[in-house]
């Protein structure tokens, strides 16, 4: 159910934060959870607290024997994603969980959306031999903005906290790896977004982001812009302010996103092609992107897996597969979809594949495909959307969400969405055989197929 009393506030012109608002003196200054405590393999782990979630980073190279103590009474316990098949043993206030391999999952009590525990397990990443910048365990580092150069390898050891943002511009062969934390809270007011990206690489080649946690950034969290050959692996990305996108793949090519946990207060994984900070060089095609094996929580607003709104160049040959969308919360505006394509500009969007995606809760929309004019539009002539493929998309529980496909029409222009293919769409185990089963609304669209049969064609007037 939507909790309007806890709505996030969007500041379209946030107060400028020109310098870090505070200096952390110790890792102990980060707020700790009073609701949860966690041990793994007999060792107590630090559980951090925010006003939107609690989280614990669990690093080990063995099997994981977890004891999660919940210090407040509750009636209903849920572990997500359900596809992991995690079966807890509950004794008193302690939840016992055994994992043979690292998993990233949530512990939720009584349907609470602002007090869940994120349990983020990973294998330990050792210090690379070629590390050029090292942040050590148990220490806090106030970097303001850490600017990388070519061939930099940043190592953030488990237990280290880096306070600030990380930027790279026209760099080759850069890496940020480790099991530590980058915290961006110093760059925004407590309840406001800010006009600054968190981890931002522009026109870089060969970029690796692996293992670390990025939490509470000032706006978009991980932004490869006009980059080539990017791997984002085993990251934990968590935001709590509006415009807190998870990953914005902007005008980049040959990108892989895998094994990540993303809880975002805007689009979780997003594809864009647009000018960034008025820089026209960041407009180019997006292609050869593969997103797989991620756990996604899309808090209001935004969408879970989004293409748009700014799609100013060609977007093609993208694959999204084997992901769990554990929450897609109600937005009530233009977003709120588990899977969306929003074309507000002129780029041609085609050959996009979605496969084996499980949706546990979609409060507003499942699919939302539109060509439109909106506040984000910069190119008036609109690009086409066609050859879009959905296969084995499962809604596992909750209400059955609506889906929408809509083209664009003015007195001088018509752009129809066409050749969209749905196969093996299921709601609570029941396969959709008709557009009515899918709760699908189409306008200005044609050649829409469900299980190989055309369910929407263009009428001749």
Name each model feature, range by range.
Residues 1-461:
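Extracellular/periplasmic carbohydrate-active domains that bind, remodel
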């Amino acid at each position: 159910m939507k909790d309007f009393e806890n709505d996030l506030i969007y500041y379209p012109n946030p107060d400028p934060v020109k310098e870090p608002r505070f200096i952390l003196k110790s890792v102990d200054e980060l707020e700790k959870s009073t609701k949860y405590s966690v041990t793994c393999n007999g060792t107590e782990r630090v559980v951090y607290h925010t006003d939107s979630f609690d989280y614990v980073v669990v690093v080990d190279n063995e099997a994981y024997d977890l004891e999660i103590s919940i210090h407040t009474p509750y009636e209903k316990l849920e572990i997500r994603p359900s596809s992991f098949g995690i079966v807890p043993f509950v004794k008193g206030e302690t939840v016992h969980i055994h994992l043979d391999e690292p998993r990233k999952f949530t512990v939720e009590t009584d349907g609470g959306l602002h007090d869940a525990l994120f349990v983020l397990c990973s294998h330990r990443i050792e210090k690379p031999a070629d590390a050029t910048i090292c942040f050590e365990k148990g220490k806090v580092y106030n970097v303001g903005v850490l600017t990388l150069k070519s061939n930099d390898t940043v190592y953030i050891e488990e237990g280290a906290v880096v306070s600030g943002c990380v930027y790279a511009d026209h760099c080759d062969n850069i890496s940020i790896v480790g099991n530590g934390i980058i915290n961006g809270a110093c760059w925004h007011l407590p309840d406001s977004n800010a006009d600054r990206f968190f981890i931002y690489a522009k026109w870089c080649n060969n970029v690796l982001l692996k293992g670390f946690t990025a939490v509470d950034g000032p706006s978009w969290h991980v932004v490869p812009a006009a980059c080539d050959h990017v791997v984002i692996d085993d990251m934990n990305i968590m935001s709590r302010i509006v415009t807190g996108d998870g990953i914005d793949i902007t005008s980049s090519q040959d990108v892989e996103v895998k094994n990540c946990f993303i809880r975002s207060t805007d689009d979780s994984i997003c594809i864009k092609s647009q000018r960034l900070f008025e820089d026209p060089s960041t407009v180019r095609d997006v292609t050869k992107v593969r997103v797989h094996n991620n756990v996604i929580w899309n808090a209001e607003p935004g969408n879970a897996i989004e293409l748009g709104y700014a799609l100013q160049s060609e977007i093609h040959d993208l694959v999204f597969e084997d992901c769990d969308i554990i929450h897609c919360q109600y937005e009530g505006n233009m977003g709120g979809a588990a899977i969306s394509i929003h074309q507000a500009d002129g780029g041609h969007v085609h050959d996009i594949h979605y496969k084996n995606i499980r949706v546990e809760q979609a409060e507003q929309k499942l699919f939302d495909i539109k060509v439109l004019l909106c506040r984000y539009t910069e190119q008036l002539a609109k690009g086409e959307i066609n050859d879009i493929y959905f296969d084995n998309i499962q809604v596992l529980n909750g209400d059955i969400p609506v889906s929408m496909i809509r083209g664009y029409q003015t007195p001088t222009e018509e752009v129809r969405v066409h050749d969209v293919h749905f196969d093996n769409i299921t709601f609570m185990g029941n396969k959709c055989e008709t557009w009515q089963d899918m709760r699908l609304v189409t306008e200005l669209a044609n050649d829409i197929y469900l299980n190989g049969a055309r369910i929407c064609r263009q009428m001749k007037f």
